[in-house]
Amino acid sequence: MKNITTLLFDVDGTLLDATEFIIQATEHALSVKGLSVPDRTTISKNVGASFPDYYFSLTGTHEHTNELIEIHRTFQYSNYHLAQPYPNSLQTLKYLKAKGYKMATITTRSKKTSHQTLINAGVFDLFDVIISGEDAAALKPDPAPLF
């Protein structure tokens, strides 16, 4: 077996607890558009999909998708503090970096929100590569962002 030299991490739900960051943005966007706001369990089950698929799964229509995405992002730009690092994530990443591992993150979120939440968590500079939603032709779980 070859030695492992590189580690890949998801951001939301692995390094950061972004539950409130995502759910509150979703609730806000749907409310602003006057649409029905599903319960938090339903919202959580759909997290991770592309924005168009995410909002379609919650509303059953593509009619307001672009507006919902814009409202969602605007909310997040003012509420980065809602994404918090999990306990010991900073210490663990520092330990791995000190051991010489190359490290990268892969997320479906935008570059702006993923970078800022990683900066706020104090882990941004520990990564050699940060792959965001707009960096790849296909999103997770497709392996395309890795190549």
Model-derived features: where do they sit?
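N-terminal helical cap/lid subdomain that shapes the substrate entry/recognition surface
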Residues: 2-90, 95, 99, 115
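A short linear-motif detector with a strong N-terminal bias
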Residues: 23, 109-110
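Structural motif
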Residues: 46, 106-108
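Substrate-recognition "cap/lid" segment bordering the active-site pocket of phosphatases
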Residues: 82, 110-147
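Short loop/edge segments at beta-strand edges and connector loops
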Residues: 87, 107, 132
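Short active-site oxyanion
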Residues: 100-105
